[in-house]
Amino acid sequence: MPFRIAFLKQPFEDFFKHQASGGIVLLGATVLALVLANSPWSGQYFHFWEIKLTIGFDHFGLTQTLHHWINDGLMAVFFFLVGLELKREFMDGELASFRQAMLPIAAAFGGMLVPALIFHFINPMVPEAKGWGIPMATDIAFALGVLALLRGKISRSLAIFLTALAIVDDLGAVLVIALFYSGELAVGKLLVALVLLLILIAGNRLGVQSLNFYGLLGFCLWVVLLKSGLHASIAGVLIGMVIPARPRLCHEEFVDQTEKYMARYKEIGEVPGPFHHEERLGALLALEHICHDAMSSLQRMEHELHHWVIFGVIPIFALANAGLVLQLGNLVTAVTHPVTLGVALGLLLGKPLGILFFSWISVRVGLCALPRGTSWMDVFGVGILGGIGFTMSLFISNLAFMNIVMSNNAKLGIFIASMLAGAAGFTVLSRASARKAH
């Protein structure tokens, strides 16, 4: 029986370990949303996301539609993971030193600025102009999924460069949401949020490691920001940035305590039966506690949340937001609409041009150097993959447009650009690797 269960589990475990699997699940959720939106069950599909759900009590609770709970609540978990990744990268990653950080920062800045300018050039007037932030984003799950298909053909440094670029890109998108896509701000609630944030920072500086402390105050921060007019997703990033990055035990303490309890475990010896002797169990539990304390809260949470976000949060978001009614009679009109063109051209042209040009400038003036084993053709290919906006672009489009026609046109532009960018980026990087091989 155990063999049969293992036999059934193995294919799933292998799939979830593969780097491209997150993009595959996200693509599946998107296709399902499009199929449902254009099926006989279209009405039920859209109605389902408008069901109201109350969390709390009669006089102390939050009532939102299911769609809003996903965009404001569930996506806060995604942004929390973004905050954790940002902190790790700035402390001990590709963004830890000035010279290392300059290339992805410059590339991300160009990859945000040029698409926004292209969109604004095509849509200079309000209300269409409000969508300028949509083509600024990169979907890291899809982009890394395409790179994973080229495993063995591209350098590891190129994958690290794309990851760092996408993380900086996410930070830029968060700032854009906070500054330009939040509602009317309630100053009193923002002051309460600031006090909560300062308490969280103080807890971090004082060495508080309890995740209950950060979880409780973090939830309060999310609720206050939700009520303040500032988009609640910002709370996720802020909480992620204050999670402790240093473990309770240093390397020497971990080694000493591990050796101590391993020696005790060996002394007790093996006991008959499936259950451990009380002292032996105590040694095992102590080892478990030591291993827990040897890993920082930041790394542990990032590790534990990664799969839940990639295979749960983001696909659910896509399922709720990617539903687009495609009518053949209006398709030509929709494709040629300025919002559709602005989003599509911003992602398809603006992203690669901005990333390539700003990378070239930063290398040319001596601020940084290209990653080892990377050519300018590789950077151009990464720039094209940056045009896969998807998750964050869909998120911003929901904030930019209340008008359903404009929102749908923005989604159409995102879909067109993301598909073409994925195919073109794969082709360019494949040819670049083939040239190196020869």
UniProtKB/Swiss-Prot annotation:
Keyword Acetylation part of the UniProt annotation: no
Residues spanning the membrane: 21-41, 66-86, 102-122, 130-150, 160-180, 183-203, 206-226, 308-328, 341-361, 376-396, 410-430
InterPro entries for this protein: Na/H_antiporter_dom_sf, NhaA
GO terms assigned for molecular function: sodium:proton antiporter activity
Subcellular location per the Swiss-Prot or TrEMBL entry: Cell inner membrane
Tree of life domain: Bacteria
Gene Ontology biological process terms in this record: regulation of pH
Function comment: Na(+)/H(+) antiporter that extrudes sodium in exchange for external protons.
Protein name: Na(+)/H(+) antiporter NhaA 2
Source organism (scientific name): Syntrophotalea carbinolica (strain DSM 2380 / NBRC 103641 / GraBd1) (Pelobacter carbinolicus)
Gene for this chain: nhaA2
